[in-house]
Amino acid sequence: MAKSLRSKWKRKMRAEKRKKNAPKEASRLKSILKLDGDVLMKDVQEIATVVVPKPKHCQEKMQCEVKDEKDDMKMETDIKRNKKTLLDQHGQYPIWMNQRQRKRLKAKREKRKGKSKAKAVKVAKGLAW
């Protein structure tokens, strides 16, 4: 069964609401933990992941140099993609494209291929007017 536009929109809006209310939810959970003294923080760390903000500037020069070396080690893998068909060099569609759209494009591509083959057969047989 296909997903309706309404359900997609609702899901998107719920995700936005979660982002907006995340700080309030975190503070509420922390206050609950403060009330119950026998709960260990190790147990909480297994359940929820705590994100620590990263410093904007490197504090030591050694850390900056190490980061630069890691950036150089990255492999550049540019995926060559046909702009018209959206297929890459291996014949795969992009991840973000849904299955119905892939199926539709594949059928369209095969339809064009079939027409050109039929035309070639007619020309070969001498039936072209």
Swiss-Prot record:
There is a cross-link at K67, K74 (Glycyl lysine isopeptide (Lys-Gly) (interchain with G-Cter in SUMO2)). Disulfide bonds: none annotated. It is found in: Nucleus, Nucleolus; Chromosome. Residues 1-21, 100-122 have a biased composition (Basic residues). The keyword Ubl conjugation applies. GO terms for molecular function: basal RNA polymerase II transcription machinery binding; RNA binding. Its main location: nucleus. InterPro entries: LLPH-like. One of its GO terms (cellular component) is chromosome. GO terms for biological process: dendrite extension; positive regulation of dendritic spine development. Transmembrane segments: none annotated. Belongs to the learning-associated protein family. In hippocampal neurons, regulates dendritic and spine growth and synaptic transmission. Interacts with CTCF, MYO1C and with the transcriptional machinery, including RNA polymerase II and TBP. This is Protein LLP homolog. The gene is LLPH.
